Amino acid sequence: MQTLDPVDAASLRDDVPAFRPGDTLKVHVKVVEGARSRIQVFQGVVIARAGGGVRETFTIRKVSFGVGVERIFPVHSPSIDHIEVVTRGDVRRAKLYYLRSLRGKAAKIKEKRETPVG
């Protein structure tokens, strides 16, 4: 057991949904402007997950007004209000950096089909 494990365990969130690269997420982020605080939603495709434990991060990419925007979030950050999984993507890679060079429909990710139970 490592020395920092008990300290790290106290900082871990338990409300993080299961998501993978290729999934489309809505990340609700707490933004503080002066004395006011509000929630801002950042929706995009997960192109990478990195690290582990308390230091785990994920990168989300979206196209806003024709410009690609990427943002890296720590999974267990207190500034994240909550995370919603919008759609599940069907991809074969862990890092989807190739999406940066694709435009329009070519950058679209196939949606994973849920198999019916029963």
UniProtKB/Swiss-Prot annotation:
This chain's protein is named Large ribosomal subunit protein bL19
Which Pfam families does the record match to this protein? Ribosomal_L19
UniProt superkingdom: Bacteria
Q: Which GO terms describe its cellular component?
A: cytosolic large ribosomal subunit
| Gene Ontology terms describing biological process | translation
Enumerate the InterPro entries for this protein: Ribosomal_bL19, Ribosomal_bL19_CS, Ribosomal_bL19_sf, Translation_prot_SH3-like_sf
Q: Which family does it belong to?
A: Belongs to the bacterial ribosomal protein bL19 family.
The job of this chain, per UniProt, is described as: This protein is located at the 30S-50S ribosomal subunit interface and may play a role in the structure and function of the aminoacyl-tRNA binding site.
Please give the Gene3D superfamilies that the UniProt record associates with this protein: 2.30.30.790
Which species is this UniProt entry from? Beutenbergia cavernae (strain ATCC BAA-8 / DSM 12333 / CCUG 43141 / JCM 11478 / NBRC 16432 / NCIMB 13614 / HKI 0122)
Give yes or no: UniProt keyword Ribosomal protein. yes
Its keywords, alphabetically, are: Ribonucleoprotein, Ribosomal protein
Is Signal one of the keywords UniProt gives this record? no
Q: List the disulfide bonds.
A: none
Alphabetized GO MF terms: structural constituent of ribosome
